[in-house]
Amino acid sequence: MSKMNGPLRVGIGGPVGAGKTTLTAALSEALRDSHSIGVITNDIYTREDAEALMRLQILPQDRIIGVETGGCPHTAIREDASINLAAVAEMERRHPGIEIILIESGGDNLSATFSPELADVTLYVIDVAAGEEIPRKGGPAITKSDILIINKTDLAPHVGASLEVMERDAGRMRCGRPFVFSSLRNRDGVAEIVKLLAEIAGLEIRSDLQVANLA
């Protein structure tokens, strides 16, 4: 459902290659049948992520807007979110009554956060292959995001990462905030993420939600 003052805006952040676009695609796929949904992607100099989503054909092309941020990608989601707010307004113009807009940031570091003016709920994706120490390094994105997604769990045995250590450290750093282990390319963990998002944002989702494997 949309908010009283417009659609629910979900910020999706994380380092380059962590799985943001895969998460955006999976959430779009899971929510498109029950909600009017759109996507805004941020890239520094291209619209590669938007084009990747269009190729997947999960949403019609007019429901995907690519933003070229230039410079530091965190600026466009935090200090000066005007370019993204303009994209939100354009999405609302195209689709009056749109209920959910997913806003995918450009790749950034652990200090990246979304401006409250831009995002109502924030999801942050990290990659097991980047090292089991990532959760304990902290930073606002790790500690304050509404949902932390620890992605690519299937790679843990190959990179020597301990999921038990990551679970312990994530629990300690997040002080009760939820986190999910996932293998997003296989759609493992997506249903749990959708359920948590629904609880946090007050969304109604189908009890028979099925998430396909699009790997």
From Swiss-Prot:
CDD domains: UreG (cd05540)
Pfam families xrefs: cobW
GO BP terms: urea catabolic process
Record note on quaternary structure: Homodimer. UreD, UreF and UreG form a complex that acts as a GTP-hydrolysis-dependent molecular chaperone, activating the urease apoprotein by helping to assemble the nickel containing metallocenter of UreC. The UreE protein probably delivers the nickel.
Superkingdom as given in the UniProt entry: Bacteria
Organism: Ruegeria pomeroyi (strain ATCC 700808 / DSM 15171 / DSS-3)
Compartment(s) where it occurs, according to its Swiss-Prot or TrEMBL record: Cytoplasm
GO molecular function terms listed in the Swiss-Prot or TrEMBL record: GTP binding; GTPase activity; nickel cation binding
Gene3D superfamilies in UniProt: P-loop containing nucleotide triphosphate hydrolases
Keywords noted in UniProt: Chaperone, Cytoplasm, GTP-binding, Nickel insertion, Nucleotide-binding
Family membership noted in the UniProt record: Belongs to the SIMIBI class G3E GTPase family. UreG subfamily.
Binding site residues for GTP: 14-21
PANTHER family: UREASE ACCESSORY PROTEIN G
Keyword Cell inner membrane part of the UniProt annotation: no
Disulfide links within the chain: none
Protein name in UniProt: Urease accessory protein UreG
